[in-house]
Amino acid sequence: MNNLKRIKVIAGNWKMYKDKNEALEFIQKVNFSIPNSKEVETIIFAQSTLLDVLVQNQGPNLKIGAQNAFHESEGAFTGEISPLNLVSLGVKYVLLGHSERRVLFGETDQLVNLKLLKALQNNLSPVLCLGETLETKENNKTKEFLEKQLTQALKDVPQEDLEKILIAYEPVWAIGTGKTASPQEANQTIKQIREKVTNLYSAQVVQSLKILYGGSVSSNNVEAILEQNEIDGVLVGKASLETKDFLNFTQAAVKLSSNCCQHFDKKC
């Protein structure tokens, strides 16, 4: 399957970095340098305490996402983040199933599924994170592991809602370690993920499904990653904290898009 019709996505996960002033400074610097959303889709996932001010100051080509949401819209759940309230702030995207949530907070595939269903119910676009550990990789169980994660996370998700979902493949062994899957290896794994979703739904609906790669993405390897046929974008961690690096990622996506247009004699 080719991805020529799918706009590339550059997503930055700020994790628990930046205070209000630092976040505003970043947004003000990048707002008018981010490429048109028709060329590349650009998202920043920030701490919940920053979401309101970032949404109020985001430029026309930048979207703000949350890093987590609860599996109920409201109620007596002290400290949790309501998906309903995220929408009221103007947030469009939410990260779900990130490996740090799974490892540090014990989130299971079943819990990720509940969060995914509630996010969709509240008209949020979830970015579903999947990824295997080093042990799983070394035991040659990556395909089976990811298929299980995927099947459980997408349980009871109707086909018509699949278009709202993005998937991010983030091998746990590559997150924040400086290690990364080779572009070809990442491409092959993402192809397998796409094939599994095809089996769960249909080939037609999967044509528009965007699957990102994350795991020690940097300015040095982003072009090689984005060039891969099955990879629709990147989810970047700490490397997205600097304005120069973040804009470099977006420009790499635009450059690739322009090259594809020229190669196939299409208008960009």
From Swiss-Prot:
The active site is at residues 98, 170. It catalyses: D-glyceraldehyde 3-phosphate = dihydroxyacetone phosphate. One of its GO terms (cellular component) is cytosol. Its EC number is 5.3.1.1. GO terms for molecular function: triose-phosphate isomerase activity. Homodimer. Belongs to the triosephosphate isomerase family. This is Triosephosphate isomerase. It comes from Phytoplasma australiense.
